[in-house]
Design a protein with these regions (language model features):
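Terminal leader/tail segments of proteins
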Residues: 1-106
Length: 106
């Protein structure tokens, strides 16, 4: 995990605003939102701890890296991977794999 991703996860965990380079975290009462290059890529619901993942319109390596860093911190059994230009999300707990859809909640 990259240093910026560790700092991003720490800001989310402690519900603090954070900005470094291309990554911004905004903490609100109901959620903590993550932005990459100004595009909304994730939200953590502070009440239910549900994590909503988005690609922000960009299926870049950096977007996938940020989303995987979030998953590693908040849903460690899940991971996003790519096969033949198609993104999937897998869950090691039950061995499932499904198509990654921007806006999905885990």
């Amino acid at each position: 995990m990259r240093k910026i991703e560790m700092m991003m996860n720490s800001a989310i965990r402690y519900r603090k605003n954070f900005s470094s380079g291309n990554t911004t975290v905004r903490a609100f009462r109901e959620s903590v939102d993550v932005f990459l290059h100004g595009n909304h890529i994730a939200s953590l619901d502070t009440a239910t701890h549900a994590l909503t993942l988005k690609d922000g319109g960009w299926q870049s390596v950096t977007t996938k890296s940020r989303l995987n860093a979030l998953l590693e911190e908040f849903v460690p059994s899940m991971r996003i991977f790519q096969n033949d230009w198609t993104r999937y999300i897998s869950d090691r707990l039950d061995g499932s794999k499904k198509l990654f859809i921007s806006g999905m909640e885990v």
